[in-house]
């Protein structure tokens, strides 16, 4: 996704956020996105990919004070779009159960693949 397309996408999605005047996301290449509030790093999303496979595992870190504003969802959406455009499928996302937010991942099209005491693993596949 080029910078102009990314900027347009974010401008249509972030209206009404308390940080909308200073919030921006940079595509760092290599399936990595960084969100900043002013000069402060707010969060990042990235993917672990295997050169011998079309599978990808998404990862995200978001500072707790920026939760509830849609920044994490935006980071995941951008990463998913990037992975899909690059032909990765399935896409997985793993989190500790205490951070389990089923509705967010369900809204992104994920379903629970596995749940145990240490990890909840979500999976996304293109519907055929």
What are these regions, as identified by a protein language model?
Residues 68-81, 107:
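Conserved acetyl-CoA-binding loop-helix of GNAT-fold acetyltransferases
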Residues 79-83, 91, 101:
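Short hydrophobic clusters on alpha-helical segments that form packing/core surfaces
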Residues 5-57, 63:
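Acetyl-CoA-dependent GNAT
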Residues 106-116:
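Conserved acetyl-CoA-binding loop of GNAT-fold acetyltransferases
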Residues 92-102, 120:
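Conserved beta-strand-loop-alpha-helix junction that forms the acyl-donor binding cleft
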Residues 63-65, 69, 97:
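Active-site acidic-Proline motif in GNAT/NAT acetyltransferases
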Residues 30-32, 116-121:
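Short hydrophobic/aromatic beta-strand or adjacent loop that forms the aromatic wall/cage
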Residues 1-8, 113:
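A short beta-loop-alpha structural element at the N-terminal edge
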